[in-house]
């Protein structure tokens, strides 16, 4: 995913945590906050060291990024932070995709109906 789609600064993460709204399921927590200047979404991913070693954490992050890449044109322009919870570490990429799509639908972050 291009740099324009990323949230990197700690201050940006903290602002979204403080002022954003959250939606969660068993595997993921989504924090979202609208931003007037955005023409597309921005994504930040957080996977705790408690979830496993670097290989496991990076696999989860890759699966999350891939899901957002697939739905890049379907997303509303928002700042989004995805936090992976413990059950996500034992899931396949397809299961991660389904779970993430579910929580994104609940958060109403799609600009059109996704099957």
From Swiss-Prot:
One Gene Ontology term of the molecular function aspect: ribonuclease P activity
Annotated disulfide bonds: none
GO annotation, cellular component aspect: ribonuclease P complex
Broad enzyme group: hydrolase
SUPFAM superfamilies referenced in this protein's UniProt entry, alphabetically: Ribosomal protein S5 domain 2-like
Pfam families registered for this protein in UniProt: Ribonuclease_P
Alphabetical keyword list: Endonuclease, Hydrolase, Nuclease, RNA-binding, tRNA processing
Record field: catalytic activity: Endonucleolytic cleavage of RNA, removing 5'-extranucleotides from tRNA precursor
EC number from the UniProt entry: 3.1.26.5
Coiled-coil positions: none
Record-level GO BP terms: tRNA 5'-leader removal
Family: Belongs to the RnpA family.
HAMAP family per record: RNase_P
Matching PANTHER family: RIBONUCLEASE P PROTEIN COMPONENT
Subunit structure: Consists of a catalytic RNA component (M1 or rnpB) and a protein subunit.
Job of this protein: RNaseP catalyzes the removal of the 5'-leader sequence from pre-tRNA to produce the mature 5'-terminus. It can also cleave other RNA substrates such as 4.5S RNA. The protein component plays an auxiliary but essential role in vivo by binding to the 5'-leader sequence and broadening the substrate specificity of the ribozyme.
Name assigned to this protein: Ribonuclease P protein component
Source organism per UniProt: Staphylococcus carnosus (strain TM300)
Taxonomy of the source species: Bacteria, Bacillati, Bacillota, Bacilli, Bacillales
């Amino acid at each position: 995913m291009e740099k324009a789609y990323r949230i990197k600064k700690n201050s940006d993460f903290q602002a979204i945590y403080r002022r954003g709204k959250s939606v969660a399921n068993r595997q993921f927590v989504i924090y979202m906050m609208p931003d007037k200047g955005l023409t597309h979404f921005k994504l930040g991913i957080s996977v705790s060291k408690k979830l496993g070693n670097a290989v496991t954490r990076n696999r989860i992050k890759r699966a999350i990024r891939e899901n957002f890449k697939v739905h890049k044109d379907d997303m509303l322009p928002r700042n989004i932070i995805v936090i992976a919870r413990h059950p996500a570490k034992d899931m396949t990429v397809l299961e991660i995709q389904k779970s993430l799509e579910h929580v994104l639908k609940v958060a109403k972050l799609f600009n059109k109906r996704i099957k």
